[in-house]
Structures are given as structure tokens and as C-alpha cells.
A protein has these predicted regions:
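Extended, low-complexity, acidic/proline- and Ser/Thr-rich intrinsically disordered regions
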Residues: 1-4, 10, 102
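Amphipathic alpha-helical scaffolding segments comprising HEAT/armadillo-like alpha-solenoid repeats
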Residues: 1-2, 23-35, 54-65
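Structural detector for internal amphipathic alpha-helices that build alpha-solenoid repeat scaffolds
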Residues: 6-22, 43-54, 76-85, 143-146
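Alpha-helix N-cap/N′ positions at the starts of helices
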Residues: 10, 25-26, 135
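Conserved aromatic-histidine-acidic binding/catalytic patches
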Residues: 18, 33, 37, 128-132
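A cyclin-like helical interaction fold
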Residues: 40, 55, 61-129, 133, ...
Length: 178
């Protein structure tokens, strides 16, 4: 494969085994989310679809018909991802999911992502400045795991999300108030 990449004068795309893995992830993890009755699960499915290597190859007519049958909010998110529209509210949700996805510890925690979408919508409804997603995400993650077997210390959260203890404490108080 590396030899082919070196001698090829055109972009050969992803390796066959990468595409096969993407197809498997799509069928086992993403498709059930896209078909879920809950809009938050479908949004998360759209997010994961956008993260896949070789997603263009997986976009069959059947998948497009599923995407076309989604509600306007979900289609707006899809348009935001594909065309790069500036949509502050969806951008806030998306930036939070991206940050979670970049951290291996959180990457496969479906309930965390679904709960983030719900929490982000609650934060958005409070009409606060959405520029600093990390502070809201840090407070949310701390609260999310606080009462589980995976509780994280504030120090771990501060290190993972690069926020100050002051901002974390202040944002936890804010989230508890809504």
C-alpha cells in the first residue's frame, strides 16, 4: 500500500482495510444511531458519520434517504458540517462533541455525547456567550461522571479541558442553576 501511494500520481484515497473498518463502524455503531427515534441520537450519528474515514464511499442512496427523512434541525446540522455554515448554536454543540471525541477516554461513551447535546441545548437557552465551549464542557463532564464508578477529580477535568479551577467551579454552579 505504501508503495502504491509513493508511485501513484493521483490521490488513491484510504487503504482498503481502513474503508472496511469504517464500514464496520458505520453498520454497528452509526446506522443504529441514525435510525433512532430520539433526535439527539440522530445528531450524534450524524457527528460520527462526519468523523469516518472514507465516508464518501459509504454514502449510498439508502443512507441519503435516511438523512433526507430527518427533521429540519438534523438537516441543518448536516448542512453545517458539509457546507461549513456559521450557526452559533449548532457550532457550540459540535465543538463540544469534537473535543470529547478527541479525548480517547470519552470517545466511545455514547451516553456522554447524548447528555452533552441535551446540556448544551440548556446552556444555549440561557443566552450566554457560547465562545468558551471548554468551560461548559468541563463542568458538564465533571457533573456527568460525578455519581458514577468513573468519577473524575476536578484536577483531571482541569487538565483534560485546560480550564482554570475558578472557571470550572463557576460553570458548575451555573449548570446546577439551570
Amino acid at each position: 500500500w505504501n508503495k502504491l501511494l509513493q508511485i501513484s500520481k493521483v490521490d488513491v484515497g484510504y487503504a482498503p482495510w481502513v474503508l472496511e473498518e469504517s464500514k464496520s463502524v458505520f453498520n454497528q455503531r452509526i446506522l443504529p444511531l441514525l435510525l433512532d427515534d430520539d433526535s439527539h441520537y440522530r445528531l450524534y450519528g450524524i457527528f460520527l458519520l462526519n468523523q469516518l474515514n472514507g465516508k464518501e464511499i459509504l454514502m449510498t442512496e439508502e443512507i441519503w434517504s435516511i438523512l433526507e427523512s430527518m427533521n429540519d434541525y438534523e438537516k441543518l446540522y448536516l448542512t453545517y458540517l458539509v457546507q461549513g455554515l456559521t450557526l452559533n448554536k449548532l457550532d457550540f454543540i459540535h465543538r463540544g462533541m469534537l473535543k470529547l471525541y478527541e479525548i480517547d477516554y470519552f470517545k466511545n461513551d455514547t451516553s456522554l455525547f447524548i447528555d452533552w447535546i441535551d446540556q448544551a441545548e440548556a446552556v444555549i437557552s440561557e443566552k450566554v456567550d457560547l465562545a468558551e465551549v471548554d468551560r461548559y464542557l468541563a463542568a458538564f463532564v465533571y457533573m456527568h461522571y460525578k455519581h458514577t464508578n468513573h468519577a473524575m477529580t476536578k484536577k483531571q477535568i482541569i487538565d483534560s479541558f485546560e480550564v482554570t479551577r475558578y472557571k470550572l467551579d463557576k460553570t458548575i454552579a451555573f449548570i446546577l442553576s439551570i
